[in-house]
Amino acid sequence: MSTPSGSNPLPMADKLEAKGGNGGKIWDDGVHEGVSQIYIQEGSTGGIASIKFDYVKNGQPKAGSTHGNSYQNFTEWFDLNHTCDEHILSVKCYYDEGEIQGLVIKTNIRTSAYMGYNIGTTFTLEVKGKKIVGFHGSFDKNLTSLGAYFAPLSPAK
């Protein structure tokens, strides 16, 4: 398969099933070169009311879609330095009462602070030796489930 001049081919990726609650509207951002930013809006009574992922396309940031109820501004965000090949290795999710309550992002360089609420049981989206290149999940009143696409790590330069 040929690639248009000036564009990078998308990595081969494995889809890790969404975890968390059931039901709600399913969304899928697909596969990208990488993730550049993550934004969340905390729910007024717990959970994550909305989430947005910005991605990397042809080495440049590309705005993603907002998933959920974006009735206010995002309350927390996490920027990745994709120009220095910072990439997400795992996402630790806090889950309670049928909703994702919070996230902790681990990259090859650092780990984020809690985003949202650190209550409930945890699960981790992670595949050893791979990086996250896209997200999918579902929403009802708040974020109910989260899954990810994983691609092989680039060889060290």
Swiss-Prot record:
Database matches in Pfam families: Jacalin (PF01419)
Tissue and organ distribution: Expressed in stems, leaves and flowers. Not detected in roots.
PROSITE patterns with a match to the protein in the record: JACALIN_LECTIN
Listed GO MF terms: carbohydrate binding
Record carries keyword Cytoplasm: no
Protein keywords: Lectin
SUPFAM superfamilies: Mannose-binding lectins
Phosphoprotein in keyword set: no
Induction and repression of expression: Not induced upon virus infection.
Domain Jacalin-type lectin residues, every copy: 13-152
Coiled coil ranges: none
UniProt cross-references to SMART domains, sorted A to Z: Jacalin (SM00915)
Role of this protein: Confers broad resistance to potexviruses. Inhibits virus accumulation at the cellular level.
Record family assignment: Belongs to the jacalin lectin family.
Name of the featured protein: Jacalin-related lectin 15
Native species: Arabidopsis thaliana
